[in-house]
């Protein structure tokens, strides 16, 4: 039989059971627990107690396993606990966790390790008289403090409530008393790590142990793990004996196989000679255990020489002797004598041990176990929560970060806000949350933050966000509407009325009617001129009954639209026939409009433009004292022909279906919109405008400084048939001038017209300005005459959108065309066409007024044509572009060249 016996619970051999159960043998139970770094996980190696080194056995360590060690003639029962703090047990647990995927992060894994160790430690505190906490290093691991503190809370809050009841009901463990344990176990701290102090220097080792004892005692007292009353402490610390031991024997960490091989080689290499005491000692060290290779008789008779040496086993025996003599009473003098200490027989103790093992180890490991005792149930449910200080810490900082993030999100929230604002606020809150949140609870708290923010936004804070025709979202709360006009973005623009005299605030439109018609009807009530001025009526839908609806159609003319865009013609070629002479702007007598009047619409190609620019004429001003700089003068030849008998067959518009969008070149024939998107009014006589001072502020408000001048356009008109009306015109002119000087035939048939034009742009802040060319804003000086020519705006496409010169970098839109007609026996005609490009030049729409004939303007008058504020095709509104620059302005939309023309009129003396 080996000098020391062992078995693994609960498999106790019969022969060992008889030895332990005989004569009610009393034993001091010493628990060995802590950490180990060797594969065998045996922490008794440093005690020099084992006869066979654990490395030579085939037993694999396992979490929660308890191994009993005792000597035949000894009084100490060693309980060796294998826990998750043992390195190789932890490694096996980690490998299983990785393989199964149960633990998804280190925090959770570490929490599991700590919880399992704490269960075993609590169990050891209940069944042991002494506990040796083994540390393989030379430094005390302060992470034990949190475990000790948590176990003290668990014991006081749960264990002392349920354990006495369970022990009483089972008739086992009555010897444990009210404390439900043998005593307040005495803790010994055993450090296996070698220090820099040599084993021979005992005084320094003792000094180190004393200093470590003081530090450990202070930490335990500060955390209230030990108190003056040891019965109320988790465990006790001896008052007058050492409880810290540093192992200075390097053999405790030696590898027996490697050491044996080294010693054998040393022995074999030794010169031959007689044996001495050193050789005998060397041979004994080669044996894997005492008595190896010797007869059983010699082993039984031989006794180990007891040398007085410094060892943990000697320290333990001192404490054991005190336990047998007086018991442990480590309380202060005030509480001394009240402590509970009992040494039961092994048989009695073992029955209680099995019950406590089931309560503290087996039942918590069984996930399906259920108990009727509420206190025990609370213990099982809350043990992990209390022990797991890391998870609690990370949960608390996540909760703290979550609270701050919630407050940050709620701070200064508007009454309603958009999804973009919501996401921005959430990102700000989430950024604040991530400054604090750490650990495995981050994802769960992130989801809580997301749900919280979404719930606030969706429950009464969600903005409608329905986009306006200018791209601004509705600022009202989420609501159901029957009509788009019920939306409101809260954005206010500044715009002028139809005549341009009055500026007012306009709401961001949600329908074409709001943008192109309703606003101008409303502001007309505030304007002193709009409702009294002469105006041109544009064709609109006039229902014949109350049963009318919007037309449903597929734009079959889309291909025709694309082909006509580049030739500057409308698809209806019969209404506007092309010019026969491509190289001359002259109008022949055979080119008559339907009312038999001579008509000219300028639609110049590049070749004609070059020819026109080469013709220079002197300009004359009837009302100006100063002459303008020489500019391009266009000569128009007006011929008088016979009235055409043929009339174009016009299709009557529908009275039951209306056009849902705006009129454009490819709109179905016979469909008209419900309201006009254009406006043409006569502001008054031409004398309103004076080229010296520009457009008066009281007539047209909101113009930028120097940008309120119209551009003069001089057009030379030559008469081919003076006998028609030219002779009468010259006769009246001569009479008016009181002169009878005859003129040559050529000069009497030619005269110059001065027409003042202005293409006006207006930004959303109400800034207005005239442009002198497709890429140039008019810059007129104070007190000087603008010398720019109007031919640039007549013979070029003018962009619909252009950057406003104001500081806010707004986009201005072409909103008005100013025309001051001359005092002459001709009429200026206009036929505006707006081409809006949608991505490419092949995808565009040309919007028209809907009139079948060009508009004839009266003589000597100031006319203003107001263009649509919003454009809408068959598929819906066309959003104004963003990022408009001078270079790309013409790529978004243009007012097409060829808008202006001249038409003859009846001669009367009132015109002169």
Curated annotation (Swiss-Prot):
Pfam families: Smg8_Smg9 (PF10220). Coiled coil: none annotated. The keyword Transmembrane helix does not apply. Residues 570-602 have a biased composition (Polar residues). Residues 604-614 have a biased composition (Basic and acidic residues). InterPro entries: SMG8-like. Residues 565-630 are annotated as: Disordered. GO terms for biological process: nuclear-transcribed mRNA catabolic process, nonsense-mediated decay. Keywords: Nonsense-mediated mRNA decay. Belongs to the SMG8 family. Involved in nonsense-mediated decay (NMD) of mRNAs containing premature stop codons. Probable component of kinase complex containing SMG1 and recruited to stalled ribosomes. This is Nonsense-mediated mRNA decay factor SMG8. It comes from Culex quinquefasciatus. The lineage of its organism: Eukaryota, Metazoa, Ecdysozoa, Arthropoda, Hexapoda.
């Amino acid at each position: 039989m080996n000098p020391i016996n062992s078995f693994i619970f609960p498999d106790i051999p019969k022969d060992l059971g008889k030895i332990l159960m005989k004569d009610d043998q009393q034993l001091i139970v010493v628990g060995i627990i802590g950490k180990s770094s060797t594969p065998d996980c045996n922490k008794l190696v440093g005690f020099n107690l084992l006869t066979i080194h654990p490395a030579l056995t085939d037993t694999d360590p396992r979490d929660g396993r308890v191994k009993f060690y005792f000597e035949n003639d000894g009084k100490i029962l060693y309980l060796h606990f294998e826990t998750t703090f043992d390195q190789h047990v932890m490694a096996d647990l980690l490998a299983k966790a990785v393989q199964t995927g149960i633990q998804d992060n280190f925090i959770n894994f570490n929490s599991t390790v700590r919880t399992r160790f704490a269960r075993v430690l609590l169990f050891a505190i209940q069944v042991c008289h002494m506990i040796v906490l083994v540390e393989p290093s030379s430094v005390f691991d302060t992470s034990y403090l949190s475990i000790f503190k948590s176990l003290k809370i668990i014991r006081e809050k749960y264990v002392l409530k349920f354990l006495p009841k369970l022990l009483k009901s089972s008739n086992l463990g009555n010897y444990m008393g009210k404390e439900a344990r043998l005593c307040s176990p005495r803790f010994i701290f055993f450090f296996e790590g070698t220090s820099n102090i040599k084993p021979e220097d005992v005084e320094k080792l003792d000094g180190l142990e004393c200093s470590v004892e003081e530090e450990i005692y202070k930490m335990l007292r500060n955390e209230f793990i030990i108190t003056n009353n040891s019965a109320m402490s988790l465990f006790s610390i001896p008052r007058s004996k050492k409880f810290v031991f540093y192992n200075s024997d390097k053999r405790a960490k030696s590898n027996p196989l490697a050491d044996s091989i080294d010693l054998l080689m040393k022995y074999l290499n030794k010169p031959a000679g007689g044996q001495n005491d050193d050789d005998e000692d060397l041979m004994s060290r080669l044996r894997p255990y005492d008595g190896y290779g010797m007869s059983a008789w010699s082993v039984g008779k031989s006794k180990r020489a007891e040398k007085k040496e410094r060892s943990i086993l000697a320290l333990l025996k001192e404490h054991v002797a005190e336990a047998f003599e007086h018991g442990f009473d480590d309380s202060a003098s005030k509480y001394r004598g009240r402590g509970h200490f009992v040494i039961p027989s092994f048989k009695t103790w073992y029955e209680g041990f099995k019950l406590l093992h089931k309560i503290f180890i087996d039942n918590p490991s069984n996930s399906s176990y259920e108990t009727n005792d509420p206190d025990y149930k609370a213990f099982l449910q809350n043990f992990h929560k209390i022990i797991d200080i890391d998870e609690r810490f990370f949960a608390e900082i996540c909760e703290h970060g979550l609270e701050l993030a919630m407050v940050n999100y709620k701070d200064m929230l508007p009454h309603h806000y958009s999804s973009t604002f919501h996401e921005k606020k959430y990102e700000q809150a989430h950024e604040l949350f991530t400054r604090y949140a750490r650990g495995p609870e981050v994802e769960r708290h992130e989801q809580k933050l997301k749900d919280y923010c979404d719930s606030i936004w969706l429950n009464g804070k969600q903005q409608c966000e329905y986009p306006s025709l200018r791209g601004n979202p509705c600022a009202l709360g989420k609501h159901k509407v029957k009509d788009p006009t019920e939306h409101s973005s809260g954005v206010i623009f500044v715009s002028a009325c139809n005549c341009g005299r009055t500026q007012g605030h306009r709401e961001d439109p949600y329908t074409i009617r709001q943008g192109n018609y309703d606003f101008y009807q409303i502001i007309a009530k505030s304007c002193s001129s709009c409702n009294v001025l002469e105006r041109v009526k544009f064709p609109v839908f006039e229902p014949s009954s109350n049963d009318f609806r919007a037309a449903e159609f597929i734009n079959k003319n889309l291909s025709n639209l694309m082909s006509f865009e580049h030739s500057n013609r409308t698809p209806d070629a019969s209404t506007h026939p092309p010019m026969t002479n491509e190289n001359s702007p002259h109008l022949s007598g055979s080119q008559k409009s339907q009312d038999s009047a001579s008509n000219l619409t300028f639609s110049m190609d590049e070749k004609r433009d070059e020819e026109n620019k080469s013709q220079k004429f002197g300009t004359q001003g009837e009302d100006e004292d100063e002459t303008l700089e020489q500019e391009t003068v266009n000569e128009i030849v007006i011929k008088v022909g016979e009235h055409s008998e043929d009339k174009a067959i016009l299709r009557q518009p529908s009275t039951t279906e209306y056009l849902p969008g705006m009129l454009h070149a490819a709109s179905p024939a016979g469909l008209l919109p419900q309201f006009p998107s254009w406006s043409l009014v006569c502001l008054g006589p031409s004398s309103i405008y004076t080229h010296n001072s520009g457009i008066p502020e009281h007539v047209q408000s909101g113009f930028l400084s120097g940008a309120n001048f119209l551009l003069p356009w001089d057009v030379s008109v030559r008469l081919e048939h003076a006998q028609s009306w030219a002779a009468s015109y010259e006769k009246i002119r001569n009479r008016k001038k009181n002169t009878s000087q005859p003129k040559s035939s050529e000069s009497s048939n030619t005269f110059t017209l001065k027409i003042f034009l202005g293409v006006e742009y207006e930004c959303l802040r109400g800034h207005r300005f005239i442009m002198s060319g497709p890429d140039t804003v008019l810059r007129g000086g104070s007190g000087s005459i603008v010398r720019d020519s109007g031919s640039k705006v007549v013979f070029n496409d003018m962009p619909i959108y252009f950057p406003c010169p104001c500081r806010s970098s707004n986009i201005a839109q072409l909103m008005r065309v100013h025309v001051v007609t001359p005092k002459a026996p001709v009429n200026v005609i206009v036929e505006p066409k707006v081409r809006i490009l949608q991505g490419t030049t092949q995808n565009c729409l040309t919007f028209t007024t809907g009139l079948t004939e060009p508009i004839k303007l009266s003589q000597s008058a100031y006319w203003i044509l107001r263009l649509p504020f919003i454009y809408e095709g068959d598929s819906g509104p066309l959003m104004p572009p963003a990022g408009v620059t001078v270079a790309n302005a013409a790529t978004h939309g243009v007012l097409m060249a060829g808008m202006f023309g001249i038409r003859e009129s009846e001669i009367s003396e009132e015109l002169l």
